[in-house]
Amino acid sequence: MKQTIKLLKQAKTIALFSHTSPDPDTVGSTLALMKILEKMGKKVDVFCAETNDKFAYLECYDRYSTDETAVLNNYDLLVAVDVPDQTMLCGFEQAFLSHKNTLRIDHHTKGNDYARHNICENQSACAVLIFEIAKKLKVKIDSETATLLYFAICGDTGIFKNSNTDSVTFRICADLLDFGADFKKVYTEFFLKSTLEYIKLSSHILLNAKTNDEYGYVVMRVSKSDYDKYNPEQNENISNLPNTYLNCGYKIAVIAKEKEDGIHCSFRSKFEYDCSAVAAVFGGGGHKNASGCLIDASLDEAVSQISNAVETYLKSI
């Protein structure tokens, strides 16, 4: 942590990076760190390979740039926030790796130490580290920053339902509420809102899931044609649909989503099972009960490979 604080204090111009397929933790943590550093008088820009309108209600989300041609050598320091693997920087990867002064702030202990400097602590969310950094920098957290950090923590803890939720998480969130975090806005705008098209697509996916009662797992699939047929808004996320089957008693549930660059897979598991071990088979990872990976195969092939990997894992424990 001392080295991290030193780097952030010394740099005058800083570029922050979130991971591709952005989630609440990478977005909330990155934007919160941006605001903290700007309070110190730093010039800060934020980058991500892609954006998602689902986060547009956040007041400073429009600060993100997707310009992968940006000249990153002009910055004193590049910081990857909640990015466990350099490939999740996408088009920014090579420029990041070639920069002389880089920092990775992360809570994925199974990630890669690809930056020149790495701080990685096993916390419920990367936002916990950003909160601690703000304290070390002696920067007062305002209501907007508190809302961003609260949003980030809610995302990675599943609104405090996931097994990574601990007493530290609750203590920090209590502090964030005292600082003015708008928990009602976070819950209403991000976790509650939906559309009829999304509900129809979700129903289709759930009803056509492949269940295996012998080993206790489920694999769901969504094809490009499913997206075209039901046409949900781009900002709606189906990655948490597997939780529905966990609530029915299944041990592990997976959803495989057909995209242009391959099959994006989201894994969820009950507390006592480690779905990250399955995701790791395909070069992915994440958390014990919530992980992901990208498979370069057809949708049918990916579903078959996932089923085999899940069965192999469940047989081994």
What are these regions (language model features)?
Residues 33-34, 95-98, 120, 171:
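Glycine-rich, phosphate-binding/catalytic loops in enzymes
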Residues 70-72, 94-97, 111, 141-143, ...:
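Solvent-exposed alpha-helices and their adjacent loops that cap or buttress functional pockets
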Residues 61-116:
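Active-site cofactor/cluster-binding pocket
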Residues 2-20, 26-56, 63, 71-75, ...:
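Hydrophobic helix-and-loop "lid/oligomerization" segment in the mid-to-C-terminal part
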Residues 16, 46-48, 104-105, 141-143:
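General beta-strand structural signal in soluble alpha/beta enzymes
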Residues 102-104, 117-119, 217-219, 255:
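Conserved beta-strand scaffold positions in the cores of enzyme catalytic domains, especially
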Residues 17, 21, 80, 104-105, ...:
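Generic enzyme active-site microenvironment
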Residues 105-172:
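Short alpha-helices
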